[in-house]
A protein has these predicted regions:
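Ribokinase/PfkB-type carbohydrate-kinase core domain
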Residues: 1-180
Length: 180
């Protein structure tokens, strides 16, 4: 369940979906939107050295329309009866996860449906789900500040436990090089 725009990335995605035989019934095409993407180009010269260039972001800067939002919610309701787990990747400020869509996802979780949520900006708004923040997202959801820079391992564990209690959720917090 997602949306693609009417741009070249959307056309590439459609081609990949079609060639792989993927069911596209719940992929909404929105011609006036960008297909969101975070691209991490890898650079390699004549030597064997390979390194990552700065990330290229293709993002929308306006919310989806109410019509698209309604279609997302309709599709969410349709698929929930045919899947065992809903994995939510809420990574863009102006992606398909609006407050109304998130409320629908939370309602599914509260009804006993298994929902796993990973959100760059809104992890603290998901309740009754399995949450997968990184240490910074978890810290911000609990303390709403930038104090994570000086935090140690134990403080991150405490933040994850507080988030779990506050949101009635199981939390799997990734800790970069320190694991999860």
């Amino acid at each position: 369940l997602s949306h693609i725009g009417g741009d070249w990335r959307g056309m590439l995605m459609e081609d990949i979906f079609q060639k792989s035989g993927m069911n596209r019934d719940f992929v909404i095409k929105v011609p006036d939107r960008f297909t969101n993407a975070y691209c991490k180009p890898m650079r390699k010269g004549i030597s064997e050295l390979e390194y990552e260039d700065p990330r290229l972001d293709f993002d929308n800067y306006e919310p989806i329309s109410k019509e698209t939002e309604d279609k997302v919610i309709e599709n969410l309701r349709k698929i929930s009866g045919n899947i065992d787990v809903l994995c939510v990747a809420d990574q863009f400020r102006f992606g398909i996860i609006t407050k109304r869509v998130r409320d629908e996802i939370i309602a599914l979780a509260k009804s006993g449906f298994t929902v796993i949520a990973d959100s760059r900006y809104n992890i603290g708004k998901y309740t009754d789900c399995i949450l997968k923040p990184n240490e910074v997202e978890c810290w911000r959801a609990v303390y709403n500040n930038e104090g994570y820079i000086d935090a140690g391992y134990d403080e991150f564990i405490d933040a994850a436990q507080l988030l779990a209690k506050k949101n009635r959720s199981t939390v799997f917090c990734t800790l970069a090089q320190r694991g999860s």
